[in-house]
């Protein structure tokens, strides 16, 4: 966090009482009924960490989180330098707005022109892609966001760092009422300070934040009051919507925002389990055995949001970012009926051509005997409504 960000956060935090909920518990405690109240410190409804066959979060000797699978390799400084200096960048993002508008149009979301239609109240599910890993999900009488970033840059500063080449389809003020936000990890393209501040200013303590273990203090400094911090396999709910369960589930990634804070915060995916629908958000991840575990416990899902971009060069990126073929493997592992593509077409974060991910996705789907509707790609601002009553759902 830069100095301006720190000062802004201190000023903002003084507007709210420091009553964020630290849902931290020992796995040996009783597993009784959960209370999704903002001030609850009771145990969880069901702690899946008590099951011996789930992969639990793990810390190294230095107290920092580590990936527990052999599929992981740390991104060393020499390898980072090799990537930045030696590898050719094939992203080829055009500078022409006209060309970008033709190739990657940004649509006005339905909720701007027809705000009265926001909120799915029947058994259906609707998703709207707002760019990168930001998805607005409407299901089971709730509306929530994943990894919201509405800023121009994914960076500590809005004057440098990765810049959007496709604008956000809407502003935060144009969103319908949001009940919850899911954060997968603390990288700048998934946890955006300005977006957190703006969402908190608009919705206040009526907005519930679900965040990984270790992120609560940062959220408090931003002034967020209604925060639930979870370990892998822990769960909680939005007050008044206890039939919809938000479970923090594993992924293979890492965390860092400042020079010395590597992996002090956990990373993960989210499994949202409702009476009518089940939604999976993969966040940012390399391929690992966790997804079979998630599918075994919570599948089949009705819809999953799975990343397909930022994967080249593979020798460096494969540990932290899946490629389109691995995304299809996740689709299969978590046992989802449909998937939507995220984490592409917004920021140039790796070396593949900016239009390549959907092409590679379709090739992978063919190899797996799936069609484009099984794992679909939306335009920026586009929505997709899925109905449980539909035979093709």
Swiss-Prot record:
Keyword Nucleus on entry: yes
Gene: NAPEPLD
EC class: hydrolase
Start-end of Polar residues biased regions: 1-16
Organism of derivation: Homo sapiens
Annotated consequence of substituting residue 257 to A: Impairs binding to bile acids resulting in loss of activity
Protein name: N-acyl-phosphatidylethanolamine-hydrolyzing phospholipase D
Functional description taken from the UniProt entry: D-type phospholipase that hydrolyzes N-acyl-phosphatidylethanolamines (NAPEs) to produce bioactive N-acylethanolamines/fatty acid ethanolamides (NAEs/FAEs) and phosphatidic acid. Cleaves the terminal phosphodiester bond of diacyl- and alkenylacyl-NAPEs, primarily playing a role in the generation of long-chain saturated and monounsaturated NAEs in the brain. May control NAPE homeostasis in dopaminergic neuron membranes and regulate neuron survival, partly through RAC1 activation.
Binding sites annotated in the UniProt record for deoxycholate: 256, 260, 348
Domain of life: Eukaryota
GO BP annotations listed: host-mediated regulation of intestinal microbiota composition; N-acylethanolamine metabolic process; N-acylphosphatidylethanolamine metabolic process; negative regulation of eating behavior; phospholipid catabolic process; positive regulation of brown fat cell differentiation; positive regulation of inflammatory response; response to isolation stress
InterPro entries in the cross-refs: Metallo-B-lactamas, NAPE-PLD, RibonucZ/Hydroxyglut_hydro
Catalytic reactions of this protein: an N-acyl-1,2-diacyl-sn-glycero-3-phosphoethanolamine + H2O = an N-acylethanolamine + a 1,2-diacyl-sn-glycero-3-phosphate + H(+); N-butanoyl-1-hexadecanoyl-2-(9Z,12Z-octadecadienoyl)-sn-glycero-3-phosphoethanolamine + H2O = N-butanoyl ethanolamine + 1-hexadecanoyl-2-(9Z,12Z-octadecadienoyl)-sn-glycero-3-phosphate + H(+); N-hexanoyl-1-hexadecanoyl-2-(9Z,12Z-octadecadienoyl)-sn-glycero-3-phosphoethanolamine + H2O = N-hexanoyl ethanolamine + 1-hexadecanoyl-2-(9Z,12Z-octadecadienoyl)-sn-glycero-3-phosphate + H(+); N-octanoyl-1-hexadecanoyl-2-(9Z,12Z-octadecadienoyl)-sn-glycero-3-phosphoethanolamine + H2O = N-octanoyl ethanolamine + 1-hexadecanoyl-2-(9Z,12Z-octadecadienoyl)-sn-glycero-3-phosphate + H(+)
Subcellular compartments: Golgi apparatus membrane; Early endosome membrane; Nucleus envelope; Nucleus, Nucleoplasm
Location, primary (coarse class): Golgi
């Amino acid at each position: 966090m830069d100095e301006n960000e720190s000062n802004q956060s201190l000023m903002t935090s003084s507007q709210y009482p420091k009553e964020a909920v630290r849902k931290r518990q020992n796995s040996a405690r009783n597993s009784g009924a959960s209370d999704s109240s903002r001030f609850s410190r009771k145990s969880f409804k069901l702690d899946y960490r008590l099951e011996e066959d789930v992969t639990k979060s793990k810390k190294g000797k230095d107290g920092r989180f580590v990936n527990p699978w052999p599929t992981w390799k740390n991104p060393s400084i020499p390898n980072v330098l090799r990537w930045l200096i030696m590898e050719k960048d094939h992203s080829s993002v055009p500078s022409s707005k006209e060309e970008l508008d033709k190739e990657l149009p940004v649509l006005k979301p339905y909720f701007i022109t027809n705000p009265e239609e926001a909120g799915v109240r029947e058994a259906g599910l609707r998703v709207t892609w707002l760019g990168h890993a930001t998805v607005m999900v409407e299901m089971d009488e709730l509306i929530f966001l994943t990894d919201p970033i509405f800023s121009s840059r994914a960076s500590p500063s809005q004057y440098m760092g990765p810049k959007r080449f496709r604008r956000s389809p809407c502003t935060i003020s144009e969103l319908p009422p949001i009940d919850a936000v899911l954060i997968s990890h603390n990288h700048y393209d998934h946890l955006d300070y300005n977006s957190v501040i703006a969402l908190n200013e608009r919705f206040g303590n009526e907005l519930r934040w679900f965040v990984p273990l270790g992120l609560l203090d940062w959220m408090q400094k931003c002034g967020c009051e209604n925060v639930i911090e979870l370990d892998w396999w822990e769960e909680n709910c939005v007050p008044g919507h206890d039939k919809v369960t938000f479970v923090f589930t594993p992924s293979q990634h890492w965390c860092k925002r400042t020079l010395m804070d590597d992996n002090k915060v956990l990373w993960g995916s989210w499994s949202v389990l409702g009476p009518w629908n089940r939604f999976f958000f993969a966040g940012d991840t390399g391929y690992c055995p966790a997804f079979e575990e998630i599918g075994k416990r919570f599948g089949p899902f009705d819809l999953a949001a799975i990343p397909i971009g930022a994967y080249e060069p593979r020798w460096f990126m494969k540990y932290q970012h899946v490629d389109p073929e691995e995304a299809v493997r996740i689709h299969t592992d978590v046992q989802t009926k449909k998937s939507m593509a995220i984490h592409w077409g917004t920021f140039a974060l790796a070396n593949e051509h900016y239009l390549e991910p959907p092409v590679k996705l379709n090739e992978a789907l063919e190899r797996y005997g799936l069609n484009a509707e099984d794992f679909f790609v939306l335009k920026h601002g586009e929505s997709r409504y899925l109905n449980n009553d539909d035979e093709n759902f």
